Amino acid sequence: MKHPISTVALSLAATLAMSFARPALADEAPLQLQTYRADAGSFHVASVLVSGKTDAVLIDAQFTRADAHRLVADVLASGKRLRLVYVSQGDPDYYFGLEVIHQAFPEARIVASRATAAHIRASLPEKLKVWGPKLGANGPSKPIVPQVLKGDRIELEGQSLQVVGLDGPGGFYSFVWIPSIKAIVGGVRVFGDMHLWTSDSATPAERQCWAQDLRRIEALAPTTVVPGHAKPGAAEDLSAVRFSLGYLEAYGEALSTAADSTALINAMKRRYPQAAGDDVLALGAKVNKGEMRWDAVTVCR
């Protein structure tokens, strides 16, 4: 589904300053967003096509070959030239589909933050070992590791897509802020009407860092927020950020009183009876209650 979004009104000072360098943004066509969201088998992960008049940038690349092919179809149907793919997170559901996308658009650059690219390279053998047998022909045969993005901006037809989060602990979690249309896309921090992936955030410090990232998004006052994972039909606005913040707080409270993972699962289901992702909730509960070992990426101490 396409999401036309209005152009940001610039302040007088900013407009005057910009006019000496190039035409004001008001004279440019606003960028357009189109979200592709996978089904539950791929954790409802999102990819977002950001389009200008003739060119486009893709944020995140899907998990399975099937979803990647559907994503390619969306890009082709848009009629835009795909210039670049940015991978915002180092989990397989964000990059396994790169192989299919590269085959369809070989001239499009594929990039990620330095920390994300390094994590993908280091963890790829284990990820293939785990997911290869489960995905079979639906998984990558020649997975692609992104190149390192130079700087913290992606340019699309004179408009800036800012990669935010590179100044955090290791630059592992990032999202894309598009100020001209006040939109946040990419990243794994925002969930919409879905149980949060807490397996990688099994300490109070990690959850606090997560909450800080969400408040950073909130402070930008975006009008559009595309959750990295969301139940189909979930809103794409700040309500997803507030949902995620509330969930983290509720999770911490339930975790502190739950005797075991079953009690934690039941408590969160009572609190969020309509949330998708029961498998995600169950895995996180086992990890957080110490019933299952999980090699998490630690970015906060």
Question: Where are these predicted regions, by residue range?
Answer:
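Positively charged n-region of N-terminal signal peptides that target proteins for export
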Residues: 1-7
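N-terminal signal peptide c-region/cleavage motif recognized by signal peptidases
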Residues: 21-23
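Active-site metal-binding motif and surrounding structural segment of the metallo-beta-lactamase
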Residues: 66-111
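Conserved beta-strand hairpin/beta-sheet module of binuclear metal-dependent hydrolase folds
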Residues: 27-77, 175-188
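Metallo-beta-lactamase
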Residues: 63-64, 119-250
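Bacterial N-terminal signal peptides
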Residues: 9-19
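Accessory terminal helices/loops
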Residues: 219-224, 232-301
